[in-house]
Structure formats: structure tokens, C-alpha cells
């Protein structure tokens, strides 16, 4: 083993010790799970985290698959500021697609030695919502009012890896689609997680084609104002800022198409994506 490899090994061991018994909320987007190799790499990375006594909680999206099915059905997908406009038909499609993705992720993790369990935001009052009107009326899109963190903590105590589908409910029983980035951030805040990690299909936060390895809250907001951050990255950065202001120590954006990018980002000094901190 070379001296360089030894140095990396010591880095990994140091971080493993630091993060033992800590909670990581990992949001994985549908686009990052398009390829079989990416699915396998992600599942193995999550199982590794559990083996080194980190508590991973997965929140998954499904935007790519939802859009694909809508197009196949002749329904035009609409977005506003990165958020999906969700009428009743779109909500039905979203729930169906998200349920399938949830089962696929659970199966993949379990096949690689994990103990994952799939849950919906409607299970045990996990995600109580109200209609989100921050971007105008965009239909059945929910703003989370309360997270039943005790439910998740019970699952962790039983050595489960929770895989959460971002669908919630209102006090009147109305079902709401929740942006998965928002759901992940709110769950991380509720659990006082150590890290919030976005596994996407881009290297991280980009400017002029170059990766930005480190960002603080002030500069993250500036990138949104300047239009550098746009589309689906807007909710991620907004959620990252909210999480950091609420006490989450760091937020990361990594490319799930790179094998084990999640572990490289967490367990090495320089990482592979973008790390955001408050200052």
C-alpha cells in the first residue's frame, strides 16, 4: 500500500469515528437512480454507512419517472420555480410512481445486506402538511407543518434503514405531493441530523461549468439571486440554507452516477461534490 493510500485510509477511519451514531438524511433523486450501476452503488454505500454505525435515512424523489409517465399519457408536466404543478391526475401519477421507486430502493438495499423498510409520509402521521402557496396555487403540493420524528427514531432503534416516500396528508385527509428536497430538509431538521445529503445527477453546484466545492449561506443565496442556480437546483439550495440556519452542520450535493460518490464526499477531506456550511 502506498503512502498516499495510507493517508486516505487514515482520513476514512477518522471520519468513521467522528460520525459513529450520527444521523444522515440522504435525499436521492430519480435521475440519480436511472442506471442499474448507480442503483447498486447507492445501495452498497447506504449499507456501508449502517455497518459503520451511521444512521442513514433515505428520502427519495421520482421526478424523472413521473415526467416520463405523464408524457406517455399525453399530460404536459408544468413547473414553477422548480416545483411541480400538481393537479389531481398528476397527484395520482406521482403517488403510483413514488410507491414503485420506494419498493425498488428497499429491495436493492436489502439485497446487499441492509435492513431497509419503506414508509410513506402518510404512515403514522409522519408528514402533516398544509397546502403550499409560497409559489402561488400549484395544486396538491404540501408544505410540511410537522414531522413525527418519533416514528423514524423507533425504526432506527430497531436497526431499520427508513426509506421515505415524500407524500403527506392534511388535517382533512387531503393527500399532498411534497418536493423531496423539502421533505428531506424538514426531516433532517426535525431529527437534528448531522448531515443532509442530496444525491443528484450533477457533480454539485456549478458556475460557468466549474464545480463549486464549498459554499456558505450568503454566497448560496447570491447564486440564486444571480440566476446561476436555477431549475431543480433552486429547491435544493433553498432547503440547504434552511437546514443550515436550523442547525444542520453541513449539506452536501453529489453526483449519484459516480460510483460511491456518497462515501467519497463524506469520508475524505476534499470530497467530490459541493459542501455547504452556514459560514
From Swiss-Prot:
Annotated function: Catalyzes the ATP-dependent phosphorylation of N-acetyl-L-glutamate.
Pfam families noted in UniProt: AA_kinase
Enzyme Commission number: 2.7.2.8
Reaction(s) catalysed (UniProt annotation): N-acetyl-L-glutamate + ATP = N-acetyl-L-glutamyl 5-phosphate + ADP
Enzyme category, top tier: transferase
Associated pathway: Amino-acid biosynthesis; L-arginine biosynthesis; N(2)-acetyl-L-ornithine from L-glutamate: step 2/4
Molecular function, one GO term: ATP binding
InterPro entries for the chain: AceGlu_kinase-like_sf, AcgluKinase_fam, ArgB, Asp/Glu/Uridylate_kinase, NAGK-C
Keywords of the record: Amino-acid biosynthesis, Arginine biosynthesis, ATP-binding, Cytoplasm, Kinase, Nucleotide-binding, Transferase
Cellular-component GO terms for this entry: cytoplasm
Name by which UniProt lists this protein: Acetylglutamate kinase
